């Protein structure tokens, strides 16, 4: 053994196990502008003090392990360790606490959501001393966000590409989601776009199955887009799902979409993974493609109040990794989403600077330092009677996506698209005239239906359809 090794191993080192809080609970710590800050909702096991639990979270998601190791003496733990700097009880909940943890920037690889999540939401979520753990929010410092490209294009560039301003964009997911041949699929796309929609969409689980291989779908969809554009004089698009079993195959599909002259492709970013998503986003930036993001699998991660990752964190991660649209829930449709919580992460997707606002679940002020914004996509169980509420809730910078609410029209796909476009134009005009969409929404739709038989038929079909269930994930 060399003298140097003897010194490191023998002086100032004491083997054994010590409380995490002795090293990682630092209530006097003043956070730095360059720190990544995290807010964890934690439920300690009975008998575990909250300070020890919070320190364990900081340790196990940064430099710590279960026992003292002599190699701690070979580095500066004070420089690299995470610190639990504050703990507060959760009002109305027994044995739940918000633990605030600060991470030094040196812990993370530049431009890698994958690496950031591997540390912050890695093994610590299986730690036995905790009954449950949920990451509620992250503060991404400008010094770190500037290492990411972010969305391929952003909201303003997309509007300029489409030449569409002053209203939400309209979309439709083609149904049935599985089983159509490529030609019949293309026909449905054409009918919806011709009827007045801006976009149609592959469902998230449409990849390249035996009933419809991806190349055939891309070709028939391209024909539908060019035909509908020629007939309407508007720029149209279809979210061609490039998600695949390998990154190489994903990129091949995106490249083919670009060769066809398509304006937008799609990716399932959680099932596909952040590494694949960032790779595709960079390709889209370099090649002029918009990128639509679906959040399939998110509810497995974010729906439970006491364990997992809140969607506001997944939304921030997507903005960093890259995407021009992302599904965000509807507030009024069939999918989970409380209004204030939803509007909180919608602002985190679209705006450049978002103030801390605990009433909407925003734990930290977030400055994106001019990173392009992401359009929220409201989709899931919505129809023409929801149009006024959706316009009022989400505003112009959004995509309102009606699948069954288009294709379920009694007269067919094109009339379903007409009904949605008429309803949207009526709501936008009424809002611009100063009318209150929240109070007068149904009256506005009824007035418009008097001169649109397509809208009148849609109103009759869906007049009794509501999805009234208690929200699980509330503030």
Curated annotation (Swiss-Prot):
SUPFAM superfamilies with a match to the protein in the record? RuBisCo, C-terminal domain (SSF51649), RuBisCO, large subunit, small (N-terminal) domain (SSF54966)
Can you say what this protein is called? Ribulose bisphosphate carboxylase large chain
Q: Look up the record and name the cofactor or cofactors this protein needs.
A: Mg(2+)
Q: Origin organism of this chain?
A: Anthoceros angustus
According to its UniProt record, how is this protein modified after translation?
A: The disulfide bond which can form in the large chain dimeric partners within the hexadecamer appears to be associated with oxidative stress and protein turnover.
The record's gene field reads rbcL
What Pfam family is a match for this entry? RuBisCO_large_N
N-acetylproline: modified positions = 3
- What does the further note read? The basic functional RuBisCO is composed of a large chain homodimer in a 'head-to-tail' conformation. In form I RuBisCO this homodimer is arranged in a barrel-like tetramer with the small subunits forming a tetrameric 'cap' on each end of the 'barrel'.
Q: Which family does it belong to?
A: Belongs to the RuBisCO large chain family. Type I subfamily.
Q: Which reaction does it catalyse?
A: 2 (2R)-3-phosphoglycerate + 2 H(+) = D-ribulose 1,5-bisphosphate + CO2 + H2O; D-ribulose 1,5-bisphosphate + O2 = 2-phosphoglycolate + (2R)-3-phosphoglycerate + 2 H(+)
Q: Which residues carry this modification: N6,N6,N6-trimethyllysine?
A: 14
Active site residues per record: 175, 294
Q: What does this protein do?
A: RuBisCO catalyzes two reactions: the carboxylation of D-ribulose 1,5-bisphosphate, the primary event in carbon dioxide fixation, as well as the oxidative fragmentation of the pentose substrate in the photorespiration process. Both reactions occur simultaneously and in competition at the same active site.
- Name a GO CC annotation attached to this entry: chloroplast
Alphabetically, the GO molecular function entries are: magnesium ion binding; monooxygenase activity; ribulose-bisphosphate carboxylase activity
Name the Gene3D superfamilies for this protein. Answer: Ribulose bisphosphate carboxylase, large subunit, C-terminal domain, RuBisCO large subunit, N-terminal domain
Q: What is its EC number?
A: 4.1.1.39
Keywords in alphabetical order:
Acetylation, Calvin cycle, Carbon dioxide fixation, Chloroplast, Disulfide bond, Lyase, Magnesium, Metal-binding, Methylation, Monooxygenase, Oxidoreductase, Photorespiration, Photosynthesis, Plastid
Propeptide feature: residues? 1-2
